[in-house]
Amino acid sequence: VLLPRLETPLLDIVIATLDGTLAELDIRWSEQAAVCVILASGGYPGSYKKGLPIEGLADVQDALVFHAGTAVGEDGTLVTNGGRVLGVTGLGRDIAEARQQAYAEADKIRFEGKHYRTDIAMKALR
């Protein structure tokens, strides 16, 4: 949820860190809120199946999808390959909007056994 809000080029930050000039760099952040929902494999955090086809990624339009436990199957399709499969990050004017965006887009992604927490960012909304 941090990198999507970073407006200063990450390379500039890395170079300033290496040069010892990070304190002089004006690091800028977007005012948008960000919420990330992790899509996990069925059985996670215990044992889970790998190699299950993942569908619906092309339908995600209003969120960023970060791959974690994914791989390309023998037939060239995207498949599950870990417990924490994908992170779906929604951005919005506030946390409520970012949360709504993340969950709406996460629902478009399909794979057998997919599950996720439904309470992400709820403490921040109280």
Feature map (PLM): residue ranges:
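Active-site "cap" helix and flanking loop/linker of ATP-utilizing ligase/carboxylase catalytic domains
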Residues: 1-62, 73
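Generic C-terminus detector
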Residues: 73-75, 79-126
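Beta-strand->loop->alpha-helix junctions that form or flank phosphate-binding loops
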Residues: 4, 55, 64-71, 112-115, ...
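Hydrophobic side chains in beta-strands
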Residues: 39-40, 67, 90, 122
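RNase H-like, Mg2+-dependent phosphodiesterase core
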Residues: 54-69, 88, 96, 102
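Short, surface-exposed, polar/charged, turn-prone segments marking secondary-structure boundaries
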Residues: 17-19, 62-67, 93-95, 116-117
